Amino acid sequence: MEGKNQTNISEFLLLGFSSWQQQQVLLFALFLCLYLTGLFGNLLILLAIGSDHCLHTPMYFFLANLSLVDLCLPSATVPKMLLNIQTQTQTISYPGCLAQMYFCMMFANMDNFLLTVMAYDRYVAICHPLHYSTIMALRLCASLVAAPWVIAILNPLLHTLMMAHLHFCSDNVIHHFFCDINSLLPLSCSDTSLNQLSVLATVGLIFVVPSVCILVSYILIVSAVMKVPSAQGKLKAFSTCGSHLALVILFYGAITGVYMSPLSNHSTEKDSAASVIFMVVAPVLNPFIYSLRNNELKGTLKKTLSRPGAVAHACNPSTLGGRGGWIMRSGDRDHPG
């Protein structure tokens, strides 16, 4: 460690998918399509929820936050990757790398928390429908979103500050398409055991615990659905919850493969593929699985888009914050399955 030359590295090289030289145009088109699809889908959800006061209920409040996060998560990595492919450059500045690492961790953490909150919301709606409005009150809904935002902001800040105190040697090549913490740690000349321990602790507390909560929520949901006498009702509930659970398994499975295994067992190709799943693919699928399959939301979208000035109205802060706005009418509408 100490014998290596410690130099002040001003930039890193993101190799990304550079080994796929013959497929660079295809990769550019693929990631651009995925990014724009996710961007458009999540913006549509925000537009619909922001423009219709009838959708200012707990479920759609959580959906709006999820859509916002799913706009930001791929935006922290994909534009830079597309720029590097287009310009045939692979550099990213040292401050830019740390900033990218921070925002990726922050939005991934928040995505994880929101999936957990939405699983709980679904559990209350299905298992305690008569008490839904009482349980999912304004104060609880606000706390279920505010507390995760605080944790999601502060936790990656700790990792970023710890990373900023490490020394880096002449090796500045990152075998990834973004500045992932597990790709940066092996490049350091300093002792990174504390950093690795903090990563494992973070994954254990911020990802494993919520995933267990989600699993328990869905077990209770399945148990409640099995008591429904109508076969059609069971099929509808299982169809909806099954697609949600599949996405959750995809999200957590990818994160577990990247962050729960020791650094020595990491494979560049596997890490990149797994990261694409939870950084790019999941945010694209979320709008379709959680929202665009919802007839109520699709109906609102059609009415909103056909109305002049709909976008300006939806983006007006007063639309979301007036009296009787967010979450205040949680009992006015049935919770969509």
From Swiss-Prot:
Membrane topology: Multi-pass membrane protein
Molecular function via GO: G protein-coupled receptor activity; olfactory receptor activity
TM region positions: 26-49, 58-79, 101-120, 140-158, 197-219, 237-259, 273-292
Membrane topology (Cytoplasmic): 50-57, 121-139, 220-236, 293-337
Source domain of life: Eukaryota
Keyword line: Cell membrane, Disulfide bond, G-protein coupled receptor, Glycoprotein, Membrane, Olfaction, Receptor, Sensory transduction, Transducer, Transmembrane, Transmembrane helix
Ranges of the Extracellular topological domain: 1-25, 80-100, 159-196, 260-272
Localization (cell): Cell membrane
Sugar attachment sites: 5, 8, 265
InterPro entries membership: GPCR_Rhodpsn, GPCR_Rhodpsn_7TM, Olfact_rcpt
GO biological process terms on file: signal transduction
GO cellular component: plasma membrane
Disulfide bonds: 97-189
Family that this chain belongs to: Belongs to the G-protein coupled receptor 1 family.
Role noted for this protein: Odorant receptor.
Protein name: Putative olfactory receptor 1F12P
Organism of provenance: Homo sapiens (Human)
Gene this protein is translated from: OR1F12P
